[in-house]
């Protein structure tokens, strides 16, 4: 969702609460739980999962390896669930022509830098830059070039915008900010 008037442009970013992240976290949790249950049932000698009789999988080395994979998968799954819960990467970009200020806000991981807030004067913006990498994993990213600060990404690398969409977005933003567009 975006909001735009003659003097203010606010663009909201979704962050890590995407359907694909929910699916991956859920699949990884179920798979790693299955591995851990099979490894545990081979150690106990009892069938905790009816699909695999415990006699078919001996504890050393298969049961140990499956238990290790299960524990590692649970850690990775919990990491994904935490990023979804904290909504890491969400925030907004606010461009205010009236006050001549650009504000960029993102949520990060808990701790000292949980809230990432950047402010710039519009006169410090050199250009809007489009970086295009073609190939099997094509990537198109929109950057804002700031004098003395470098380039700040405005779109996510996994957003996969079409060439027309990224050009349209860059043109509208460059027109709004009254800066040139660079393509790399």
From Swiss-Prot:
This is Photosystem I assembly protein Ycf4. GO terms for cellular component: chloroplast thylakoid membrane; photosystem I. It is found in: Plastid, Chloroplast thylakoid membrane. It comes from the Eukaryota. HAMAP family: Ycf4. Seems to be required for the assembly of the photosystem I complex. Its main location: plastid. Pfam families: Ycf4 (PF02392). The keyword Acyltransferase does not apply. Disulfide bonds: none annotated. Belongs to the Ycf4 family. The chain crosses the membrane at residues 19-39, 57-77. Keywords: Chloroplast, Membrane, Photosynthesis, Plastid, Thylakoid, Transmembrane, Transmembrane helix. The keyword Cell inner membrane does not apply. InterPro entries: PSI_Ycf4_assembly. It is a multi-pass membrane protein.
């Amino acid at each position: 969702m975006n909001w735009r008037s003659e003097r203010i442009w606010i663009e909201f970013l979704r962050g890590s609460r995407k359907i694909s992240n929910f699916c991956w976290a859920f699949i990884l949790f179920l798979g790693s739980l299955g591995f851990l249950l099979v490894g545990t049932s081979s150690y106990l000698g009892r069938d905790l999962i009816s699909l695999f009789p415990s006699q078919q999988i001996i504890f050393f080395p298969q049961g140990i390896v499956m238990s290790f994979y299960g524990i590692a998968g649970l850690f990775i799954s919990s990491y994904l669930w935490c990023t979804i819960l904290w909504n890491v990467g969400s925030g907004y970009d606010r461009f205010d022509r009236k006050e001549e200020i650009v504000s960029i806000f993102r949520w990060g991981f808990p701790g000292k830098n949980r809230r990432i807030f950047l402010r710039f004067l519009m006169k410090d913006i050199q250009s809007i830059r489009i970086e295009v990498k073609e190939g099997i994993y094509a990537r198109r990213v929109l950057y804002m070039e700031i004098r003395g600060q470098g380039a700040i990404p405005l779109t996510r690398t996994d957003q996969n915008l079409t060439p027309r969409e990224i050009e349209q977005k860059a043109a509208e933003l460059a027109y709004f900010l009254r800066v040139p567009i660079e393509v790399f």
